[in-house]
Amino acid sequence: MVWQENEDLRKQLVEASELLKSQAKELKDAHQQQKLALQDFLELCELVAELCSQKQKVWDKEGEMEVAMQKVNTMWQES
């Protein structure tokens, strides 16, 4: 009787240990995926910042072009 209980407890311990190992591996894998996702996110943030900077430069150039076109139009009208 005691031997059976001891064997059952040992079996439960082995099962719990295997479950713990499995969960630890899953946690490690999930953590690795999270790190990769964070790295991807940071790279995307850098790209978005660069695109915003380029967009602002384009808008600035458009403004310069409008001023230049107004000057050209004024010169044509004055001639």
UniProtKB/Swiss-Prot annotation:
Keywords associated with the record: Coiled coil
Coiled-coil ranges per UniProt: 4-43
Source organism superkingdom: Eukaryota
Pfam family, one: KELK
Name under which the protein is recorded: Putative uncharacterized protein LOC645739
Species for this entry: Homo sapiens
